[in-house]
């Protein structure tokens, strides 16, 4: 993390001076440099810039923060989102982010950026997740004096993920919708956006036509005298809202009913009342109104129904009472409609999966202090007090209490705990503000003044409650400052009641949607249950929220508003300093500097990081405490200075130490995963090439004469480097992204029978088609200097159009590609066997047929007959007119010895006799001494063994001339003693095939072909063990070289060389003749070639470096059994190269395979 003085520090824990002024100054420096994000440990501080900052939220920036640790890049909301997402996946724990701050501080924008990041890194989130914000903002946001798009409700958004980290669902919980905004707005503010969107679209969309007028016509909209918002097109916003509702799943009928209800609320607000002169009221407009009776009269029931006498009275209301009823109905309609919309969104998103991981984002409008603060402000500020209490509990109080409980040395730091203020509002015993208000509301004569009197009487000396000089006000000292509340309307708003006659309207409507908003309408007449108050509902919902947040790993964003004017580049020192103080940033910095950045229980720490330490990764027998200590000691952390051990947890002081530990774990896990991946890929490739080889050769055996080179040629798919040839890919076009199965050069002979030249073609076989591409000279005089040739696609043949492939029964390379309904192609391809094998592997329906006469279909429908004749002088195929002369080849029964990959049980790896893919690519690269590669005669069953390559040979003369290798049996090398190793650590076997030993034990090494797991013997017990747990014990050198005929000694001080080719002198690597049992690399080593190694291993050099590593078969008693790995002779008729694998130990593996994916791998080398 970069720390600079010019633009402040990234993490305020690093401030040299710790004070509120220093924090304020650092934020100001960073704000001036457009660095709006700053850390306090893991807490992110965000200052609203009120402008767009270049490159702050680009796609490139998002990618930069993906998968990075927090300290690697400057502070950003993306870094917090990435940490939250990765922690959820790595720890399998639910996460949440609590975004707090004043209105206009940028809380909603921060939540959007977190959602944007999670959507980008976790894959497609679905259309519902994408459009939900459009609906929520339309119905829940409004323009305020401080914010043009202020959320007027609190929401907790939960995103559900599967174990892979892909989003699968979500849920929204809403809190404290500002219902009063429906009926009243202060000057300069607007009602909810949806009202203005509907009115703006009325002229263009038929679904918005409900006899609507302009906004200034409606009483519920004209009080704020503001109808538009800069930068907001209400007509386009309505279009987006309409489309979003369709995506969510709202039917056309539902949408119509919702917008009809929005219209009804507007017209309901225009209903005005006048005094009727009789103590009641009447509607000023004489036009009929359906709710007239409900608004003008109150239905009062005396007595208890069902218990004796009761009376029902219809009492007229005065204009004020009628207006109150009108507004109460309007607020109830909008509030219930909003809840319905939230529920429909949840129905479309939520999945009921207890295994799903969740990430929650809490965005709730911030602390409010207005000129006149009423019941709504009290509720909002109470919620913010509770959120501040959560922050204190989890970051300040709980941290210090945990140090004490764990026995960690710690000096307590004082901080303001706002629990006393929360108790003042919500406590039941002694009764707090909400409880007192509920008590007053339960009495018929309860009034606002009575509530104030009882409140001040209950807390005459409370430190956070005081009276004012005004008889209708009181003061609460919140954490964010002192707020004066006016009690006017407290009781009515707390009752939050709709009179029964208003609820009864739902039974009179023909709209099922309207009736569904009031499910209690049918029971209202008989229900005896006392309705809950608004205060009770707020306490209940916020306590549920607190419980939900407490189950998650919390993350925090503290949003700060730099000025009251929403102006860019304006930083109000006093305003920001006030927020710094009440947010408790100073205490947060002090505790963070003195505390520990990371703490975790011993068991979780051990199981997460044991992979980084060889002692703990494989076979740890100690307890979790000592295991955690071993891990930290291994990475070089010192006890006391960098970490401390608590009673149940480990504590690490610096976050950089944790990041380093996490990086080391990532590298180690990647290394092991890479080994497993290589093994699986290698196994898959071996199986694939076996099937291709077998399929191609089976299609030709007994049907076509063979060429020796064709039998021994390795398969490697791409012979033209297609994958790196981007110009060729461009020529093929959009098909260049298909998987390439085969690519090679070939000759196209369609016109050669008329004297034309043979056309050279590039053949590319993909998973869908065959492409034939010509290489033509560039005729552009200027361009050809840079691009002398061009690729031209001549033909694309889809697999499903290939009718058949015809070959002759002779040894030539010609093949006729017959295409259904089109002209055919006569091609000459040297690697026809591989091509046919690939075709049959991916398209088994292709017919392979053989004939000595080809009927070639030319372009234009003409045909031509091509005949193949046997001619000793014909070679691989000489074309003359329409005749092709071919020399005799190997018998049609000739076939290579192809052995299938063998699969061992017990979790061991596959072992194969054929060469690996790498060996195939290396192909016929020579190099061998003493006659080169050992090759035997033909294999049994008529299989033809590959012939030697130039410079190589087996026992017997080389067909390319040169001196034959010495005849006669080779001299036997002296057998070395058994190889031994000393145990460095204790190892306890967890599987039946493993060998247990203690530190210092001497193990006889039997097989160390697997670099990670060796096979050994101890006290008569045989098994495998981690190679890194032992060190080899040097053993005595082998006897001096025997008689001449072996490799030439190296010059003094020089490296041991290779034996001379064909057995002659020279610094070549010695290879003996073939061992009994068949062809393969080496057999018994020449005399003096060095002693043999362990079974299946490499031979050891002779003393003084006189001989190279011999790869001959070990002498009797020293080497492995025939076919037992390197040095041993391969099975009869085996492939060239390394010998076949020897028998693997139980649960182990043979030489040449990779480490099997055991339940636990051996420890990595030190320093990994």
UniProtKB/Swiss-Prot annotation:
Residues bound to ATP: 101-108
Domain Myosin motor per the UniProt entry, residue ranges: 7-666
InterPro entries: Kinesin_motor_dom_sf (IPR036961), Myosin_head_motor_dom-like (IPR001609), Myosin_TH1 (IPR010926), MYSc_Myo1 (IPR036072), P-loop_NTPase (IPR027417), SH3-like_dom_sf (IPR036028), SH3_domain (IPR001452)
Region ranges (Actin-binding): 542-564
Gene Ontology BP, a term: actin filament organization
Region ranges (Disordered): 876-909, 921-978, 1036-1168
Top-level division of the source organism's lineage: Eukaryota
GO MF term (any one): ATP binding
Phosphoserine modifications at: 311
Entry comment, domain topic: Myosin tail domain binds directly to anionic phospholipid membranes; myosins I could therefore move actin relative to membranes and vice versa. TH.2 and SH3 bind tightly to F-actin; this together with the nucleotide-sensitive site in the head, allows single molecules of myosin I to cross-link actin filaments.
Function: Myosin is a protein that binds to F-actin and has ATPase activity that is activated by F-actin.
Protein name: Myosin IC heavy chain
Annotated organism of origin: Acanthamoeba castellanii (Amoeba)
Taxonomic path: Eukaryota, Amoebozoa, Discosea, Longamoebia, Centramoebida
């Amino acid at each position: 993390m970069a720390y600079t003085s010019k633009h402040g520090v990234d993490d305020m824990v690093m401030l040299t001076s710790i004070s509120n002024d220093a924090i304020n100054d650092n934020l100001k420096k960073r704000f001036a440099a457009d660095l709006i994000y700053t850390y306090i440990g893991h807490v992110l501080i965000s200052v609203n810039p009120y402008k767009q900052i270049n490159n702050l939220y680009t796609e490139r920036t998002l990618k930069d923060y993906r998968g990075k640790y927090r300290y690697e890049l400057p502070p950003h909301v993306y870094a917090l989102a990435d940490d939250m997402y990765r922690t959820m996946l790595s720890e399998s724990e639910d996460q949440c982010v609590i975004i707090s701050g004043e209105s206009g501080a940028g809380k909603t924008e921060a939540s959007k950026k977190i959602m944007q990041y999670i959507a980008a890194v976790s894959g497609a989130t679905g259309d519902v997740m994408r459009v939900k914000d459009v609906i929520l903002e339309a119905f829940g946001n409004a323009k305020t004096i401080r914010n043009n798009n202020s959320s007027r409700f609190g929401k907790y958004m939960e995103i559900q993920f599967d174990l892979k980290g892909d989003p699968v669902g979500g849920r929204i919980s809403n809190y404290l919708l500002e219902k009063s905004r429906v009926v009243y707005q202060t000057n300069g503010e607007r009602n909810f956006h949806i009202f203005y969107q509907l009115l703006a679209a009325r002229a263009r969309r038929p679904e918005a036509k409900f006899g609507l007028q302009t906004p200034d016509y409606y009483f519920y909209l004209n009080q704020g005298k503001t109808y538009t918002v800069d930068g907001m097109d209400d007509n386009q916003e309505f279009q987006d809202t309409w489309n979003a509702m369709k995506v969510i799943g709202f039917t056309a009928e539902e949408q119509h009913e919702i917008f009809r209800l929005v219209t009804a609320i507007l017209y309901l607000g225009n209903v005005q009342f006048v005094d009727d002169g009789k103590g009641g009221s009447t509607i000023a407009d004489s036009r009929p109104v359906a709710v007239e009776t409900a608004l003008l009269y109150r239905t009062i029931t005396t007595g208890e129904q069902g218990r004796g006498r009761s009376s029902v009275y219809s009492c007229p209301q005065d204009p004020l009472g009628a207006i109150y009823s009108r507004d109460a109905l309007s607020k109830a309609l909008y509030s219930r409609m909003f809840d319905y919309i939230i529920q429909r969104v949840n129905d479309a998103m939520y999945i009921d999966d207890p295994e799903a991981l969740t990430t929650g984002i809490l965005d709730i409008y911030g602390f409010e202090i207005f000129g006149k603060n009423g019941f709504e402000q009290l509720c909002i500020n109470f919620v913010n007090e509770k959120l501040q209490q959560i922050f204190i509990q989890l970051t300040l109080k709980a941290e210090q209490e945990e140090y004490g409980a764990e026995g960690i040395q710690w000096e307590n730091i004082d901080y303001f705990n706002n629990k006393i203020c929360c108790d003042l509002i919500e406590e039941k015993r002694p009764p707090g503000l909400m409880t007192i208000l509920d008590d007053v509301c339960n009495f018929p004569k309860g009034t606002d003044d009575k509530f104030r009197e009882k409140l001040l009487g209950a807390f005459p000396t409370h430190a956070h409650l005081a009276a004012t000089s005004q008889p209708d006000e009181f003061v609460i000292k919140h954490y964010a400052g002192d707020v004066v509340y006016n009690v006017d309307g407290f009781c009515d708003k707390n009752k939050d009641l709709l009179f029964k006659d208003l609820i009864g309207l739902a039974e009179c409507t023909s709209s099922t949607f309207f009736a569904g908003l009031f499910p209690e309408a049918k029971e209202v007449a008989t229900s005896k249950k006392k309705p809950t108050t608004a205060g009770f509902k707020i306490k209940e919902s916020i306590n549920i929220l607190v419980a939900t947040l407490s189950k998650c790993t919390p993350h925090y964003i503290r949003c700060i508003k730099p000025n009251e004017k929403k102006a860019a580049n304006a930083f109000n020192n006093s305003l920001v300093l006030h927020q710094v103080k009440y947010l408790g940033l100073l205490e947060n910095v002090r505790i963070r500097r003195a505390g520990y950045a990371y703490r975790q229980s011993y068991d979780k720490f051990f199981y997460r990081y044991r992979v980084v330490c060889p002692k703990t990764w494989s076979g740890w027998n100690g307890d979790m405490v000592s295991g955690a200590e071993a891990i930290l000691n291994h990475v070089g952390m010192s006890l006391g200075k960098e970490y401390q051990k608590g009673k149940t947890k480990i504590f690490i002081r610096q976050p950089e130490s944790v990041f380093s530990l996490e990086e080391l774990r990532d590298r180690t896990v990647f290394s092991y995963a890479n080994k497993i991946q290589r093994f699986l890929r290698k196994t898959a490739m071996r199986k694939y090439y076996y099937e291709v080889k077998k399929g191609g050769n089976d299609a030709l055996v007994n049907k076509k004469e063979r060429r020796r080179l064709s039998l021994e040629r390795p398969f490697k798919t791409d012979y033209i480097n297609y994958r790196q040839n981007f110009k060729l890919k461009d020529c093929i076009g959009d098909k260049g992204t298909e998987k390439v199965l085969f690519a090679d050069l070939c000759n196209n002979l369609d016109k050669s029978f008329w004297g034309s030249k043979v056309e050279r073609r590039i053949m590319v076989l993909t998973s869908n088609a065959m492409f034939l591409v010509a290489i033509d000279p560039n005729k552009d005089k200027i361009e050809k200097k840079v691009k002398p040739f061009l690729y031209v696609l001549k033909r694309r043949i889809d697999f499903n159009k290939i009718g058949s492939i015809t070959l002759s029964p002779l040894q030539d390379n010609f093949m006729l590609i017959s295409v259904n309904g089109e002209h055919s192609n006569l091609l000459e391809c040297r690697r026809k066997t591989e091509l046919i094998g690939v075709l049959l592997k991916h398209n088994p329906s292709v017919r392979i047929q053989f004939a000595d006469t080809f009927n070639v279909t030319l372009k234009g429908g003409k045909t031509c007959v091509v005949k193949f004749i046997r001619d000793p002088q014909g070679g691989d195929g000489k074309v003359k007119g329409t005749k092709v002369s071919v020399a005799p080849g190997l018998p049609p029964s000739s076939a290579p010895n192809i052995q299938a990959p063998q699969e061992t049980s017990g979790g061991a790896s596959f072992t194969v006799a054929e060469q690996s893919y790498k060996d195939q690519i290396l192909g016929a690269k020579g190099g061998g001494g003493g006659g080169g590669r050992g090759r035997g005669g033909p294999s049994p069953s008529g299989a033809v063994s590959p012939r030697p390559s130039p410079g190589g040979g087996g026992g017997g003369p080389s067909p390319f001339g040169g001196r034959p290798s010495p005849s006669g049996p080779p001299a036997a090398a002296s057998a070395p003693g058994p190889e031994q190793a000393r145990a460095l650590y204790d190892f306890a076997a967890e599987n039946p095939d493993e060998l247990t030993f203690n530190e210092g034990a001497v193990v006889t090494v039997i097989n160390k072909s697997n670099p990670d797991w060796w096979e050994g013997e101890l006290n008569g017990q045989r098994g495998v063990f981690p190679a890194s747990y032992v060190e080899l014990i040097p053993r005595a050198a082998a006897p001096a070289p025997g008689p001449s005929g072996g490799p030439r000694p190296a010059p003094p001080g020089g490296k041991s060389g290779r034996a001379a080719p064909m057995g002659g002198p020279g610094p070549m690597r010695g290879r003996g003749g073939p061992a009994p049992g068949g062809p393969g690399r080496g057999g018994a080593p020449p005399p003096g070639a060095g002693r043999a190694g362990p079974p299946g291993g490499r031979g050891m050099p002779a003393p003084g470096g006189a001989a190279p590593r011999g790869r001959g078969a070990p002498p009797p008693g020293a080497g492995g059994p025939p076919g037992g790995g390197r040095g041993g002779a391969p099975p009869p008729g085996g492939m060239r190269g390394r010998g076949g694998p020897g028998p693997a130990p139980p649960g182990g593996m043979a030489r040449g395979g990779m480490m099997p994916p055991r339940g636990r791998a051996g420890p990595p080398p030190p320093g990994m």
